[in-house]
Amino acid sequence: GGAGLRAAIEAAPHMKLAVITKLYPTRSHTGAAQGGMSAALANVEEDNWNWHSFDTVKGSDYLADQPAVDILCKEAIDSVVELEHWGLPFSRLENGKIAQRRFGGHTVKEGEAPAFRACYAADRTGHMILQTLYQKCVSMGVTFFDEFQVLDIKIDDGVCKGVVAYEIATGDIHVFEARAVTFATGGFGKIYKVSSNAHSLTGDGPGILYQKGIPLEDMEFYQFHPCLLYTSPSPRDDCP
């Protein structure tokens, strides 16, 4: 998905790497994100990353790692511009700048009024992010192993040395040896009865790491996106 592709772009200039993906990269659930990505560009009205950070921490009920939130909100501005330079076709204002719209929870001046902060590409922002990142990876010569499902990690003397993967098309098992491994496997929404997550989000990555005793953090905070309403099992709820 988006996180794995972006990690590959960051690492590619410094090392030989490969992306192992259960799906074709542009079929990731990142493509389900429609509304936009928030960054305090101030293209429509006054804005700054401090207000963005305030809204994010408040939206987390003050449970978020606040220094990490500051980094996220501050660097979001350059990240959006970077995606634009890589070719992401953002929607535009009449003056040619990246369009921004209101989105839930975002305000100016720490709650004074709603903020125009979400940068978007019509109603397919996530899809265009995936396409842009994948094209950037291809242009950088990143190697892809599409439709390979990771089954386990290879650990020698407490050090991760690679992964074991199943080639879906042939049923063959492969061992990939590496000096460093990054997991960016997305969520696990399909363990829940009601979820809008893609059927591929089965928690493979977190499950593998948990079985190896690798600590996982903040696992109780899980978001379904797009959101859903949980209805009662009454037959009348199925009526139009």
Task: Briefly describe each language-model feature range.
Residues 230-240:
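Single conserved hydrophobic/aromatic residue that forms the stacking wall/gate
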Residues 84-172, 177, 184, 228-229:
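Conserved redox-cofactor binding core of oxidoreductases
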Residues 1-3, 24, 124, 188-189:
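Residue-level detector of alpha-helix initiation sites
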Residues 180-232:
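Glycine-rich loop(s) and the adjacent beta-strand/alpha-helix scaffold that form part
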Residues 39-71:
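Glycine-rich active-site loop/strand segments that organize a redox cofactor
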Residues 30, 63-69, 80-100, 215-218:
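A short alpha-helix-loop-beta-strand transition element characteristic
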Residues 13-32:
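Glycine-rich FAD pyrophosphate-binding loop
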